[in-house]
Amino acid sequence: MNNFLISLALQESSTEVQGGLFDFNATLPLMALQFLALTIILNLIYYKPLGKILDERDEYIANSLTAASAALSKANDLTKRYEQDLAESRKKAQDIIKNAQQDAQNIVSSKIKEAQKDADQLMSNTYDQLNIQKEQALQNLEKQVDILSNQIQIKLLGN
């Protein structure tokens, strides 16, 4: 039986045509068609949706970057505006404080001048009243001196 199998194998090998690297039979175009079909199927099922997802992702990233840069620009503009408003408000507040200090200083100066004037007038009035009282006291003393002088003279001369 072994001999039969060996002889069959030898017969089989002698009937086959020995080819080179490729055998050009019906399997080669079939493999090419299978490759093209697989490429088309993969393109439709996998690559197009994947490409679409990647494109949408790129578009989303670009839109997000655009929106973020617009928001950053707006935030920078608002920051500059608020800083300018703050600087202007500080300047106005400093001007108001300066004017209030000047007004207060003027009021204090005028009150001091008025108080000094009132004090000078009060001293002048007091000095005048004291002079009047002094004159009256001197006149009273002169009268009393005259009366006492007359009484002393009468007592001395009359005795």
From Swiss-Prot:
The chain crosses the membrane at residues 30-47. InterPro entries: ATP_synth_b, ATP_synth_B-like_membr_sf, ATP_synth_b/b'su_bac/chlpt, ATP_synth_F0_bsu_bac, ATP_synthase_B_chain. It is found in: Plastid, Chloroplast thylakoid membrane. F(1)F(0) ATP synthase produces ATP from ADP in the presence of a proton or sodium gradient. F-type ATPases consist of two structural domains, F(1) containing the extramembraneous catalytic core and F(0) containing the membrane proton channel, linked together by a central stalk and a peripheral stalk. During catalysis, ATP synthesis in the catalytic domain of F(1) is coupled via a rotary mechanism of the central stalk subunits to proton translocation. It is a single-pass membrane protein. In plastids the F-type ATPase is also known as CF(1)CF(0). This is ATP synthase subunit b', chloroplastic. GO terms for cellular component: chloroplast thylakoid membrane; proton-transporting ATP synthase complex. It comes from the Eukaryota. It comes from Antithamnion sp. F-type ATPases have 2 components, F(1) - the catalytic core - and F(0) - the membrane proton channel. F(1) has five subunits: alpha(3), beta(3), gamma(1), delta(1), epsilon(1). F(0) has four main subunits: a(1), b(1), b'(1) and c(10-14). The alpha and beta chains form an alternating ring which encloses part of the gamma chain. F(1) is attached to F(0) by a central stalk formed by the gamma and epsilon chains, while a peripheral stalk is formed by the delta, b and b' chains. The gene is atpF2. The keyword Cell wall biogenesis/degradation does not apply.
